[in-house]
């Protein structure tokens, strides 16, 4: 299993992400150390980048936004998300996009 995601006993999957807000477009950008790097088009103002991140991940996984929760990193580039309702196989495929 990769360092950037883990599955808890309750079935929840935790993702460690490195976010680059203010990019030209929202996209996955490979690995950044022990985190998955994501470029977001949204600016880091008034929580817009956090909202865009949750929407981007939910859309990429085919989940409702309510299945994606920002656990930590509200004001940081390094964020931890909790995701319900998907598999580690699906999550692992995000790094290859």
Swiss-Prot record:
SMART domains linked to this entry: DUF167
Cited InterPro entries: DUF167 (IPR003746), YggU-like_sf (IPR036591)
GO cellular component: cytoplasm
Gene3D superfamilies listed in its UniProt record: YggU-like
Family to which this protein belongs: Belongs to the UPF0235 family.
Protein name: UPF0235 protein Daro_3887
Organism for this UniProt entry: Dechloromonas aromatica (strain RCB)
């Amino acid at each position: 299993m990769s360092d950037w995601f883990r599955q808890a006993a309750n079935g929840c999957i935790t993702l460690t992400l490195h976010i680059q807000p203010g990019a030209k477009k929202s996209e996955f950008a490979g690995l950044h150390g022990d985190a998955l790097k994501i470029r977001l088009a949204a600016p880091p103002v008034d929580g817009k980048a956090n909202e865009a991140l949750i929407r981007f991940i939910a859309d990429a996984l085919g989940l409702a936004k309510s299945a994606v929760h920002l656990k930590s990193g509200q004001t940081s580039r390094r964020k931890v998300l909790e995701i319900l309702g998907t598999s580690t196989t699906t999550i692992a495929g995000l790094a290859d996009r």
